[in-house]
C-alpha cells in the first residue's frame, strides 16, 4: 500500500486530521497536486475521499448516505420489491440480523438497514473502511439515520467468521470478482475499488464458513452471467438485469 497511497488535504482546516491519519497508517503526507502515488486520500471540507491520480483518472470516491445515488435508492429504489429484499427473506423474517462480509461502500447494507434489518458490516481493506466510517459518522447528523441498526467492524472476514460465536439470521456477501474484459459499463467506483483491493479470491472459503455460521440463509451477490461459487449449488436464484442473488437455505438446528 505504501507505494500507491498517500494522504493529503484540500483545506488547512483539516491539516491536523491528515497528519494524524498519515502517522497512524505510516503513509506520506503530500501536496494536493502530487502525482507520485496511484491514490490520494484527501480530507476535503465536506468529507474524506479517495482520488486516483493521472490524466485519465476517474472522479473521487467517497461515501454519502444522505445525498446522491445512495440516498436516491433509499427513496425511490423499490423498497421491499427489490431483489435483495426477496433474497434475504424479509417476508418470512421481517427484522433479521444480517452479517455483511464484504461491506465495500455500504450501499446494500444501508438499503437493508432502512428496511428494518439489524446489519453488521465487515470490511477488511483499511482504506475502504475509512471511507465507509467517514460516511457513517457524517450521516449521524440526521435523526432518521441515528435510528438505523448499521455498524461497521474493520477486520478480515475469514478471521471474524472463524471466531464468531453469535449466529446471524443471514450472512451476505458481494465478493469482488476479476475483470473479465474492459467495458464502458464498469462504473467508476468499481474500477477504483478493483485497482485498490483486487479480487476476493477467498470467496469460496468464505462461503464454506458462512454456511456453517448462518442461522437461516447465506446470500451471495454475483454478476448475472457468472458461475456460482465453488461448493454446493444455491437453493434459490433471484436474477436481475446485471446481477443475481444466489441463496443457500439452511435447515434449522435440531
Swiss-Prot record:
Highest taxon listed in the record's lineage: Bacteria
Main location: cytoplasm
EC number: 2.1.1.242
GO molecular function, one term: 16S rRNA (guanine(1516)-N(2))-methyltransferase activity
Pfam families linked: SAM_MT
InterPro entries linked to this entry: 16SrRNA_methylTrfase_J (IPR007536), SAM-dependent_MTases_sf (IPR029063)
Enzyme class: transferase
HAMAP family: 16SrRNA_methyltr_J
Functional description taken from the UniProt entry: Specifically methylates the guanosine in position 1516 of 16S rRNA.
This protein's name: Ribosomal RNA small subunit methyltransferase J
Protein's gene: rsmJ
Amino acid at each position: 500500500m505504501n507505494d500507491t497511497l498517500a494522504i493529503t488535504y484540500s483545506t488547512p482546516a483539516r491539516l491536523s486530521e491528515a497528519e494524524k491519519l498519515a502517522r497512524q497508517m505510516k503513509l506520506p503526507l503530500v501536496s494536493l497536486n502530487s502525482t507520485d502515488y496511484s491514490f490520494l486520500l484527501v480530507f476535503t471540507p465536506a468529507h474524506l475521499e479517495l482520488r486516483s491520480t493521472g490524466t485519465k483518472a476517474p472522479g473521487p470516491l467517497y461515501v454519502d448516505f444522505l445525498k446522491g445515488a445512495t440516498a436516491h435508492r433509499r427513496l425511490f429504489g423499490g423498497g421491499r420489491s427489490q431483489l435483495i429484499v426477496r433474497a434475504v427473506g424479509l417476508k418470512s423474517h421481517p427484522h433479521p440480523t444480517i452479517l455483511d462480509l464484504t461491506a465495500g461502500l455500504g450501499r446494500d447494507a444501508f438499503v437493508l438497514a432502512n428496511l428494518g434489518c439489524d446489519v453488521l458490516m465487515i470490511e477488511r481493506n483499511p482504506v475502504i473502511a475509512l471511507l465507509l466510517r467517514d460516511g457513517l459518522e457524517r450521516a449521524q447528523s440526521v435523526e432518521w439515520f441515528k435510528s438505523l441498526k448499521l455498524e461497521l467492524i474493520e477486520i478480515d472476514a475469514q478471521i471474524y467468521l472463524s471466531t464468531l460465536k453469535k449466529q446471524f439470521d443471514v450472512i451476505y456477501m458481494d465478493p469482488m470478482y476479476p475483470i473479465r474484459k474492459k467495458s464502458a459499463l464498469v462504473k467508476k467506483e468499481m474500477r477504483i475499488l478493483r485497482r485498490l483491493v483486487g479480487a476476493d479470491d477467498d470467496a469460496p472459503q468464505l462461503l464454506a464458513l458462512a454456511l456453517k455460521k448462518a442461522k437461516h440463509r447465506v446470500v451471495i451477490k454475483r454478476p448475472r452471467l457468472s458461475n456460482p461459487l465453488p461448493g454446493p449449488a444455491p437453493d434459490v436464484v433471484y436474477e436481475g438485469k446485471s446481477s443475481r442473488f444466489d441463496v443457500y437455505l439452511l435447515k434449522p438446528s435440531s
